[in-house]
Swiss-Prot record:
Protein origin, superkingdom: Eukaryota
Repeat listed as a keyword: yes
Sequence repeat residues: 3-7, 21-25, 31-35, 36-40, 41-45, 46-50, 87-91, 97-101, 107-111, 117-121, 126-130
Name the UniProt record assigns to this protein: Keratin-associated protein 9-3
One GO CC annotation: keratin filament
Pfam family, one: Keratin_B2
Region (11 X 5 AA repeats of C-C-[AEQVR]-[ALPTV]-[AGHST]): 21-130
């Protein structure tokens, strides 16, 4: 099984052995997450094509081959049945308050490794119809 081992750009690489498995068939170094090993957090299509629809996948270009970062998905997001706004996915760090389902996609900006992907102002706006008031 492909398991999480050494870190690469904030995400662990996939290697054989160990117990922190994310995707059994994952071969790309960016397709595993250190603390979230559920299927909904790491899509097989992410490893295969560089872009996966639905919860768990973002898109990132790579030289010499396809690379894909897995978007972080908070446990409470999964319980709510939703995940992250489309522009809040490219980050090499755990999600901030902004990246919860209460975040407003229009507030987000691109990010780089080690930086948060969203502005603090995102935190107090809602993007889901069921959200009636700020939660931060």
């Amino acid at each position: 099984m492909a398991c999480c081992a050494t870190s690469f750009c904030g995400f662990p690489t996939c290697s054989t052995g160990g117990s922190s498995c994310c995707q059994p068939t994952c071969t790309q170094s960016s397709c595993c997450q250190p603390s979230c090993c559920e299927a909904s957090c790491c899509q097989p299509s992410c490893c295969e094509t560089g872009f996966g629809g639905g919860i768990g996948c973002g898109q990132e270009g790579g030289s010499g081959g396809v690379s894909c970062r897995v978007r972080w998905c908070r446990p409470d997001c999964r319980v709510e049945g939703t995940c992250l706004p489309p522009c809040c996915v490219v980050s090499c760090t755990p999600p901030t308050c902004c990246q919860l389902h209460h975040a407003q996609a229009s507030c987000c900006r691109p990010s780089y490794c080690g930086q948060s992907c969203c502005r603090p102002a995102c935190c107090c706006y809602c993007c889901q119809p069921s959200c009636s008031e700020p939660s931060c």
